[in-house]
Curated annotation (Swiss-Prot):
Keywords: ATP-binding, Cytoplasm, DNA damage, DNA recombination, DNA repair, DNA-binding, Hydrolase, Nucleotide-binding. Residues 1-23 are annotated as: Disordered. This is Holliday junction branch migration complex subunit RuvB. It comes from Brachyspira hyodysenteriae (strain ATCC 49526 / WA1). SUPFAM superfamilies: P-loop containing nucleoside triphosphate hydrolases, Winged helix' DNA-binding domain. It catalyses: ATP + H2O = ADP + phosphate + H(+). PANTHER family: HOLLIDAY JUNCTION BRANCH MIGRATION COMPLEX SUBUNIT RUVB (PTHR42848:SF1), PTHR42848. It is found in: Cytoplasm. Gene3D superfamilies: 1.10.8.60, P-loop containing nucleotide triphosphate hydrolases, Winged helix-like DNA-binding domain superfamily/Winged helix DNA-binding domain.
Amino acid sequence: MDKESITNAEENSYDKPNNNIRPQGFDDFLGQNNIKSKLKVFINSAKKREVSLDHILFYGPPGLGKTTLAQIIANEMGSNIKATSAPIIERPGDLASILTTLGEKDILFIDEIHRLRTVVEEVLYSAMEDFFVDIKVGEGTSAKSFRVKLPHFTLIGATTRSGLLSTPLYDRFGIVERLEFYTNEDLANIVKRSSEFLNINITDEAAISIASRSRGTPRIVNRLLRRVFDFATVHDVLKIDEKFACDSLEKLGIDKNGFEALDKLYLNTIIKHYNGGPVGVDTLSVSLSEQIETIEDVIEPYLIQCGFIKRTPKGRVATNKAYGYLNLSSKYDDNYSNEERGLFDF
């Protein structure tokens, strides 16, 4: 999948940094109400006892607010935050140098934490549990190791693939929360909030239309809002209504479900090339010329959430909803025509 795809929930060049849009506190963070209510309790408890917050793991599809929540937690705790990404931390010494710069109750945020190398991850064990690191100096027989005490800090890890975390690392997180896709109502409220900061005049109906095509993801809803605003600016439209929003999104190649060409190709491949499934992700990766990680983390989560495909032990299976979306009769239906059956003859 093109990383610059407008409905790719991973961060890309469409996402212009805007500190005004990014929520700074829980009151500004719309959605994920269950998680927010629990985090408020944990934070208030830690502040009342004057201790650092337990280590936190956020997991779920990209673009749902894991990084933003980490920043909000730092703000609520009155703590400094150091943000990094697992692929950047190549050696144990890289991690040790980061840890030794932290202050008491500071927060270390590691994105894509499932991608930590094992030798780096092992440094975290003692750091998270006992707040020390052993630093090795020198090489060979002359090498020496000395122990450095660390302040009581909070590690916040974020991942789209919690299943890839090792058990020793996973078990050291005291708080583990899964972020879910957002409702259209929450996304429409995000559109209206962002519109105020960006000075965009938009109707409630247009906000709902943009929200419904945003794949349950705040990052995408803000991205689509900006692109619709681009069309409005070029065409001298002073107020974005529902029709203008829908027309603009259609021009961007995004249908009412929030699907792009690759989503349709994915469904067509399963149904027309593999008889609706089951088909393995390795095979799909070859057929689509996409990495397995992209299929599993970017394409499939929303299709599964919407009920278009199922993951089974034998592979991916298209549902009746997928057949209907492509205007095909399901192979399990009595109305399945001979012509359509021919699509699956090899």
